[in-house]
Amino acid sequence: MQDFNYFVPTEVQFGLDSESYLPALVKKYKRDGKVLVLFGGGSVVRSGLLDRIEKQLSESGFEYVKKGGIQPNPRLTVVHEGIDLCHKEGVGLILAVGGGSVVDTAKAIGYGTYYDGDVWDFYIGKAKATDTIPVGVVLTIPAAGSEISDCTVISNEETQQKLGYSDNLGRAKFAIMNPLLSFTLPDYQTACGAVDIMMHTMERYFTKDTDMLLQTALAEALLRTVKESADKLLCGKNLSEHDTLVARSAIMWASSLSHNDLMGGRGTSDFATHKMEHEISALYDVAHGAGLAAIWPSWARYVMHEDLSRFVDFATKVMGVMDNGNAAETAEAGIRAMEDCYHRWGMPVGFAELLGEKVSEETILLMADKCSKGDTFHPGYFKSLDKNDIAAIYRLAN
């Protein structure tokens, strides 16, 4: 096991009455100023959640302002609007109500409010944040794990880039997690979330450092649990309210555990699939989970001979495949089992299923060049990928 630092300071309130703790948590972590309530749109309003939050804040004496309309693959322009609003209103805490896109936007706004330049500087590696507005979360879409992670991912529409920035400074101060809030999610969002949750662990599971026995066992347990829970929710019939709650609770907590470095540290993680997907969703604005499902099998087949035993473990211990004694065949069977799982959940495999058409060679080369930053950056720890490798994986998915 390698040496590591583990820092996860987010206070989590998990459970069916977790929303009742909101006023106390806001009081505990808010700086001087108003609360900015940040949210996406429809479901938060239709469910009455936004009204309940506003009532709690008002009755507790907190001044607040609202900003809605946060979209999937959150935009830099919206971050800029949020920064301007924070300067104008004097915001002391950002309350993100929603999923990863809302939380990522909140983190970016927090960083940018205390920075004289463009917040995009953090994402292109030009600067590092020195302060931020505290962020709190009311989670409604378990997927990205941003409620506990140090990550934020933002899309720049002008440059057609989707980039991440990681900083412990931006970790949410608290996360309120009520699995009932995820009951009304459409199947597509549930499936995208399950793919993303599993992928955050798979990016850490497929590593060259296979002597991390505890992390490996934890990862396999999490992957099995999410797969089985998603199968119940998406493929089961006449699921009882109790069984639905059990499955939704497991997925919501797995969302956080999968991306808080418990399953493996960043230094030993791969994340090439994430980097390649970011280029896809930057150009085509597809759901992140769907993009991951589309590209992962091609990555897996391209790199599996780096360590077949790891893929055999994945096949047998996660996907339930029988080991036939031939490592390559068993590894391939595990990848096919994952593809079958994606299809059961209504997720795409390959570009044709994701986009409705194949991608041109020109676009493949463009994405490979951007992903590798002109072949100066080679993502991947299980296998380091240069620009030609990345293009080859895109072609396999085509």
Language model regions located:
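Active-site segments that bind and position negatively charged phosphate/pyrophosphate groups
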Residues: 204, 208-337
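Acidic-glycine-rich active-site phosphate/pyrophosphate-binding loop
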Residues: 80, 169-175, 266-274
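ATP/NTP phosphate-donor binding region
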Residues: 1-93, 351-352
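A glycine/threonine-rich phosphate-anchoring loop and its flanking beta-alpha core
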Residues: 10, 114-217, 313
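Short Gly/Thr/Asp-enriched flexible loops that form oxyanion-binding sites at enzyme active sites
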Residues: 52-53, 83, 102-116, 148-149
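Glycine/serine-rich anion-binding loops at beta->alpha junctions
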Residues: 91-109, 140-146, 283-286
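C-terminal charged capping/lid subdomain of soluble metabolic enzymes
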Residues: 311, 317-398
